[in-house]
Amino acid sequence: MRVVFMGTPDIAATCFKRIIADGFEIVGCYTQPDRPKGRGMKMVYSPVKEVAIANNIPVFQPENFRSDEVVEELRALKPDICAVVAYGRILPQRVLDIPTCGCINIHASLLPQYRGSAPYQWAVLDGLKETGVSAQHMVLEMDAGDVIDVEKTPIGENDTAGEVLDRLAVLGAELLSRVLTRAKNGDKCCGTPQCKEDVTFAPMLDKSMCPIDWTKTACQVHNQVRGLHPWPVATMELQGKKFKVHATRVVEGSGEPGEILGLTKTGLKIACGEGAVEVIQLQAEGGKRMAAPDYFRGHP
């Protein structure tokens, strides 16, 4: 079975490594074009491209699939199936129609929940206790395909989005390998249509979401800090200074929203609209990440 892999970030690289290790015949890899990064604006390969190069797999990096030339380049690979994980590119219908067995996507949510670009982050922001990954048959509508199979994982009360993603990457790799094995053995991998009444969306995160609103409940503030970590990171202002807030926990306490209730051995206690949170780790603008008590001992 001839497989073309499409993906870009770390979660995709984890899945890519797994199906390479499992011995699938991968005839090509599609990933986003190299991008300039860092102070020197040096061109950087995507994690998926790094894996492809290390395993001598041909790499293709089109900006899009609008041109006939790009589409025919994919067709020439004669894929039986395309495995797509966080590619970051829209696939038009004429691309979806190329593989004889279709395109299979691994999405980082339990579909139909959280269709869109930031599924696991919104699961944490919304305070969910469980999330997972879904394997779906790709259709033109975003994340709307029939669901073939899922893997689930709990979300701990202090888990960050980044920590959840690490687990989802491993689960996604297992799920992709399992579905490809079924397809290789002749299974059509029929899926279940998504219930339209249960559809929710996970729009892209942006920095406008970062400032903490202390009138919210302690749980909501804590979920904001967890869901926006490691990017774009929640922020607060204190004594005229701006801080990134890397870690909090919900604690007992009451006061006016935003009122400083005290500095403990483990953090800075701040009142919310309901309850309080303890800021455990923060980062002053231009500074490094520190335990809150350590920072305030040096900045009384």
Predicted regions located by residue number:
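N-terminal Rossmann-like dinucleotide-binding module
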Residues: M1-K42
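Short beta->alpha connector loops
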Residues: P9-I11, E63-R66, Y87-I90, V251
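Conserved beta-strand segments of alpha/beta enzyme cores
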Residues: E25, N56-P58, G102
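An anion-binding loop in the catalytic cleft
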Residues: T215-P300
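Donor/substrate-binding cores of folate-linked one-carbon enzymes
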Residues: A21-D22, Q32, I81-F201
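Acyl-group handling in specialized metabolite and lipid biosynthesis
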Residues: P203-K216
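A residue-level signal for conserved active-site and pocket-lining positions in enzyme catalytic cores
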Residues: G7, C29, A52, C82, ...
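N-terminal glycine-/serine-/threonine-rich beta1-alpha1-beta2 phosphate-ribose binding loop
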Residues: P36-K78
